[in-house]
Amino acid sequence: MFRLDELVERLGGELLGDPATAVRRVATLEQAGEGDLAFLANPKYQSRLAACGASAVILAPAARDLTGLPRIVTADPYIYFARVAQLFNPPEAFVPGVHPAASVASPVPASVTIAAGASIDVDVELGEHVVIGPGCRIGRGARIGAGSRLNANVTIYHDCVLGRDCIVHAGAVIGADGFGFARERDGSWVKIPQVGRVVIGDDVEIGANTTIDRGALDDTVISGGVKLDNQIQIGHNVRIGAHTAIAGCVGIAGSTTIGARCMIGGQAGIIGHLEIVDDVVVSAGTLVTKSIRRPGVYTANLPVQGHAEWVKNFAHLRHLDALVDRIRALEERKAR
């Protein structure tokens, strides 16, 4: 539990109202009650302030006078909410040690935690305070930086590198073979050995069941601060710039480079051998088929509509070339 003046002392902001007001958790405007700290990050929800039962709220300067509740005024209420949530929900503390049911073939620091069923191969390097969850598999020669945490059943293949303070969620696979095959004249396939690595920077979070393939010759590189959601597929030799965030079910084909601070919406697809510059936003469901060389927001999908309307519009779309030819002919006739 924190008093409002304690929060402001730690995190900044302007405090209006009783500084001794105590809060024990953060909550939404609709669900907040006694002892809760709510936040208003989107102005379209400001009408909900009137019925809010929170003990205090976090507001932007433009909304400071919309309520008489004790409040913290800050330039970015959503960031402030995130910082407060971190205070109320610190990371789980783990007891160092190696479970008797773990298999460890490399020397590890005394500060690490290795759970039951985990397997650590030879020549593995674990930094201080690393946590290896149950059922994880760490391949020969892999490197994991200090403070990183692997949840259950994560697999890191041989020679891959994970930086400091990373979080990898359950079922993620880092360093499996990339999809590399050469086609014979008879249509059969010859497997190309994937001899690169996956190299991941510091402070990266990787969602559940996300897969990152090792490079064919060069490395697959995920830069520091990148945030990956669940069930993302990243092909071999992909490079992702610092602090880029990618939502769930995105597929990125091999040898594509994505810049820093990009945001990729859920279920987007990016074909191989493209370049996307820094500060690009790709909308959900968009298929990227060519390089993006200017920052901005890019969308290539249709908004939802009723089925009957969609069928009618799609029928017109199938005849688009003919319609264009008819319009062009009419324009030429009019010009004469």
From Swiss-Prot:
The active site is at H236 (proton acceptor). GO terms for cellular component: membrane. GO terms for molecular function: N-acyltransferase activity. It catalyses: a UDP-3-O-[(3R)-3-hydroxyacyl]-alpha-D-glucosamine + a (3R)-hydroxyacyl-[ACP] = a UDP-2-N,3-O-bis[(3R)-3-hydroxyacyl]-alpha-D-glucosamine + holo-[ACP] + H(+). It is an enzyme of class 2 (transferase). One of its GO terms (biological process) is lipid A biosynthetic process. SUPFAM superfamilies: Trimeric LpxA-like enzymes. It comes from the Bacteria. Its EC number is 2.3.1.191. Keywords: Acyltransferase, Lipid A biosynthesis, Lipid biosynthesis, Lipid metabolism, Repeat, Transferase. InterPro entries: Hexapep, Hexapep_transf_CS, LpxD, Trimer_LpxA-like_sf, UDP_GlcNAc_AcTrfase_non-rep. Pathway: Bacterial outer membrane biogenesis; LPS lipid A biosynthesis. PANTHER family: UDP-3-O-ACYLGLUCOSAMINE N-ACYLTRANSFERASE (PTHR43378), UDP-3-O-ACYLGLUCOSAMINE N-ACYLTRANSFERASE 1, MITOCHONDRIAL-RELATED (PTHR43378:SF2). Catalyzes the N-acylation of UDP-3-O-acylglucosamine using 3-hydroxyacyl-ACP as the acyl donor. Is involved in the biosynthesis of lipid A, a phosphorylated glycolipid that anchors the lipopolysaccharide to the outer membrane of the cell. Belongs to the transferase hexapeptide repeat family. LpxD subfamily. Homotrimer. HAMAP family: LpxD. This is UDP-3-O-acylglucosamine N-acyltransferase. It comes from Aromatoleum aromaticum (strain DSM 19018 / LMG 30748 / EbN1). The lineage of its organism: Bacteria, Pseudomonadati, Pseudomonadota, Betaproteobacteria, Rhodocyclales.
